[in-house]
Amino acid sequence: MKRDLTQEVLSYLDASVEDAKKLLKELSVISAPSHFEDERAAFVLSWLHGIGAESAYMDEAKNVIYPINCEGRDDIIVFEAHTDTVFPAEVPMTWREDETNYYCPGIGDDTVNLVNMLMTVRYIVQNHLKPCCGVLFVANSCEEGLGNLKGTRQLFQDFEGRIDRLVTFDGSYRSVVARAVGSHRYRIDVATQGGHSWGAFGKTNAIVELAKLLTSLCDVELPAVGKSKTTYNVGTIQGGTSVIISWLQTPSAVILEPSKNKV
C-alpha cells in the first residue's frame, strides 16, 4: 500500500536537525583529498552499520555503498554524494560556526550533501521502506579534479547494464543539472637545457616557455554554438629549483577544459 510520507518526512526532518549537525561536524573535520578518502569512507561505513544498514559495504574504489532491493534487478537508481574534497591533506579541517553559518573546508562541496543523503538513508532504514525498484545509496570517491570520477566509474563497471539512472547531490539544492558536461584534462611538461641565470643567460628557460604557452592559450577564440559554453582553466603550475637557476628539467601545468560541446 502506498503511503503519504509528506508529514512523516517533515516530522523526521524537524526531529533530526541536531543529529544532522553533529554528523556534519564529525565528517567535515576528517581530511579527504581525492584518492585519500580512507578515513572518511570508513567513518561513513561504520555510521551506516550503526543505524542498521547492515548490507552497506566499501568497494575497491573506496565507494561506500548501501544497496536496497537490488538483487537481480536492472532498474537500479543511484543516489550519490561524494566523500572527497578539493583540499590537500595539509589544509587544517577546522570547524567554525556563528549564529547563521557553519564553516569548514569542503563543507559545501560536498559534505553537507553527503550528510543529507545519509540522514535520508536513516529514515528509510528506521521505517523499513522498500522501493519498487533497485536503489543504491553511494558515498562515492574521487569525484574532484584528478580523481577523475574514479568512484562512479567503478560503480558503473560493477553494475554494468543494471543502472537505469543516477542522481548525484552536489552543489546547491536550488538547481538541477540535467545535461552532462564533458571535460578534457591535460598535463603539459616543458623540458629545456637550462643553466645558471648568469652564465647560461640566453638559453631557453622552461618556465618562461610554459608561461608563453599559457599566455597563448588565453588568446584562443572559444567556440560558441547556440547556448553551449566552453571554458578552460589552468589549475596548477609547478617547477623550478632556485631563483638563480634557469629551470633545466620539467615544469608542468594542469589544464582543465570543460565543454558542453563535448560529452
Short names for language-model regions:
Residues 158-212, 256, 261-263:
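Metal-dependent peptidase/peptidase-like ectodomains
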Residues 31, 48, 66, 79-82, ...:
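Buried hydrophobic positions in well-ordered alpha/beta secondary-structure cores of metabolic enzymes
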Residues 26, 119-126, 212-219:
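Short glycine/serine- and small hydrophobic-enriched flexible loop segments
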Residues 101, 106, 110-183, 234:
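Acidic/histidine-rich catalytic neighborhood of metal-dependent amide-processing enzymes
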Residues 2-103:
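Acidic/His- and Gly-rich active-site-bordering loop/insert found
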Residues 81-86, 92, 171-174, 181-183, ...:
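Short glycine-enriched loops at secondary-structure junctions
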Residues 200-246, 258-263:
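Acidic-enriched catalytic cores of C-N bond-cleaving enzymes acting on peptides and small amides
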Residues 99-108, 194-199, 240:
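A short glycine/serine-rich beta->alpha loop
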